[in-house]
């Protein structure tokens, strides 16, 4: 009679096929101690549904009584660790992530340039000639028509400018999406590819709160400032891009870093700009000039003074602009600066 409950529980366990199913484990950020709950399983010893999967010990265990339901559990999760979604996408073992910065979105294949086999040994002369022809045709297949060639050139130009300016990956992706949108709407006709690429990059910088001036974009590209500004206004209107005015605060971290100023000076400059914004002192004025003046004032107040020439060179403005903004900020915010 004492064996009936055990037999009954065994029947329940047999009906629960999930106990022997492997569940894909995608979250590997805490792979050393992974305990995965499984509500559908029932412990045959105590009847508890509090079952966990311990991937560190490769066991399915009842958390209530400690009974081991299964050993040698396979961990089908990735062998790498990721701490956010972006890392998880990048490290996926199903191939490189899709990217808009490549004309084919990174979905095509490339024949490696090394003339070696899978064992690392040199291949014969006949095979090398064959690989040379295959590589040539592979390149032709990847870029099949004129529109794809133009797109490939534009995206390479965009990546070149972004690399020169040290822009992050999200800005490059955003700029590539904007450029593709301009191509789809036929906005490239009558305009230079370099000009549209530079304008898309400028718009992406403003979108992603990584501000760069038109002068900086023009310096990195082969297009003058006036053409970039004109093209930027055109594609913004046609693509219905809504961008708020650039905040001077967005420039402070970069300027302070280039001037090698401590964090206290950066915080003080941001505080000055916040007060200036509340009083309307930043509207109608160039954001770089206002940010430069705030950094200059903060550096003097904290005893780590930088000259107006040094600040002007980093901000890309004139010393006269800094002096004018300096007078406005000190007078309206009642800042006592001893020079």
Swiss-Prot record:
Keyword match Repeat: yes
Positions annotated as zinc finger (TFIIB-type): 39-70
Entry-linked Pfam families: TFIIB, Zn_Ribbon_TF
Keyword Zinc in record: yes
Gene Ontology, cellular component aspect: transcription preinitiation complex
Binding site for Zn(2+): 43, 46, 62, 65
GO biological process, one term: transcription preinitiation complex assembly
Function: Stabilizes TBP binding to an archaeal box-A promoter. Also responsible for recruiting RNA polymerase II to the pre-initiation complex (DNA-TBP-TFIIB).
PANTHER family: TRANSCRIPTION INITIATION FACTOR IIB, TRANSCRIPTION INITIATION FACTOR IIB-RELATED
InterPro entries with a match to the protein in the record: Cyclin-like_dom, Cyclin-like_sf, TFIIB, TFIIB_arc, TFIIB_CS, TFIIB_cyclin, Znf_TFIIB
Homology family: Belongs to the TFIIB family.
Keywords: Metal-binding, Repeat, Transcription, Transcription regulation, Zinc, Zinc-finger
Any one GO MF annotation of this record: TBP-class protein binding
Name of the protein: Transcription initiation factor IIB
Disulfide cross-links: none
Placement of Sequence repeats on the sequence: 156-239, 250-331
């Amino acid at each position: 009679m004492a064996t009936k409950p055990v037999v009954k529980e065994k029947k329940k366990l047999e009906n629960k096929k999930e106990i022997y199913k492997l569940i894909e484990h995608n979250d590997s950020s805490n792979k050393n101690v992974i305990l995965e709950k499984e509500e559908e399983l029932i412990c045959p010893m105590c009847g508890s549904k509090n079952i966990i999967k311990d991937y560190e010990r490769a066991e399915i265990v009842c958390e209530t009584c400690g009974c081991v339901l299964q050993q040698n559990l396979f961990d089908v999760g990735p062998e790498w660790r990721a701490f956010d979604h972006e890392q998880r996408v990048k490290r996926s073992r199903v191939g490189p992530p899709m990217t808009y910065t490549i004309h084919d979105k990174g979905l095509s294949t490339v024949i490696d340039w090394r003339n070696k086999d899978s064992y690392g040994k040199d291949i014969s002369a006949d095979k090398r000639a064959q690989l040379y022809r295959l590589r040539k045709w592979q390149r032709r297949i990847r870029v099949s028509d004129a529109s794809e060639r133009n797109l490939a050139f534009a995206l390479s130009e965009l990546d070149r400018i972004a690399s020169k300016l040290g822009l992050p990956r999200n800005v490059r992706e955003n700029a590539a999406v904007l450029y593709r949108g301009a191509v789809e709407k036929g906005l490239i006709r009558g305009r230079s590819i370099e000009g549209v690429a530079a304008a898309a990059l400028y718009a992406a910088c403003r979108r992603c709160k990584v501000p760069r001036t038109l002068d900086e974009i023009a310096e990195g590209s082969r297009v003058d400032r006036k053409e970039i500004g004109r093209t930027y206004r055109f594609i913004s209107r046609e693509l219905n891009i809504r961008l708020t005015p650039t905040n001077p605060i967005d420039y402070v971290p970069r300027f302070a870093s280039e001037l090698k100023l401590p964090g206290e000076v950066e915080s003080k400059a941001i505080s000055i700009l916040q007060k200036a914004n509340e009083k309307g002192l930043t509207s109608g004025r160039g954001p770089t000039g206002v940010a430069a003046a705030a950094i200059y004032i903060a550096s003097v107040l904290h005893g780590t003074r930088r000259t107006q020439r040094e600040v002007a060179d980093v901000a890309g403005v004139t010393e006269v602009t800094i002096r004018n903004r300096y007078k406005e900020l000190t007078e309206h915010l009642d800042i006592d600066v001893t020079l």
